[in-house]
Amino acid sequence: MSASGFQKAFEGYLYENNTDGSGKASSYLKSIEWLHAMLDIESYGFSDCKDVWSINDVSRLSALRKRVLEEKRKQSESPWVHPNIPVSYLRDGYCTSALADLIEFIPEFEHVQRVMEAHAQHTNSSELAEKLNFEPTIPDGYVHDPQSKDGQNRICEAKIRIGQAAFRKMILSNYQNRCCITGLDITTLNRASHIIGWSDPKGKKIRMDPSNGLCLSATYDAAFDQHLISVDPDNRLLISKEIQNHYSNESVTNYFKNREGQAI
């Protein structure tokens, strides 16, 4: 993938995960632009990183992040504190945080690409599930001390997060980014729900099976997770007795009761 394509993919990742509306995504993207300018002033041996988007080596980016932290600690003594560069991007940690997110993004991006390539080549669900029954690769440099307990925990958490991100991408693609109950197509509001849960031992072999997933908008995903709704073997919506017997207001009727038996 080209550097511009990689940049666009990272932008999408940031905005997709910027759910609190804080403006973090745009600040991180801007901080990388200013980091390029800082490296133009003094590269410290990182001249290859003057275009960060051309670097997909996690170890190299981790080394760059370490240098940024060192310059941050120097405060006004750093040559990167320059009249033409807003000081807040270095001083307040935006550059280091942006690089941390980029380091997290790279193995997820690479794993999702592998999953989607396999998804495009296989139409048989069980065959695809077997093909995708592999763990994400966590590259060197992703954690500071991979042999420590904390490092091992971070790697384990990363593998789960990356696997779920790939599953989400595949399920939303299968459903054309539309909630299978309402047709809602606002991607940031839709979830990839596991029919058999990710942590359920019975579902270990089918975690990545496309037939084990539904695209549901947030309300229905929460209801599904709480067993308030389910699906029968013919993929028709079932409403729990708890909803049927204990809730009677108009919203519940419209959202749930009137959809009983709907094919999804």
What label would you give each PLM region?
Residues 1-8:
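Ser/Thr/Pro-rich, acidic low-complexity intrinsically disordered regulatory segments
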Residues 90-165, 184-189, 254-264:
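A boundary/linker detector
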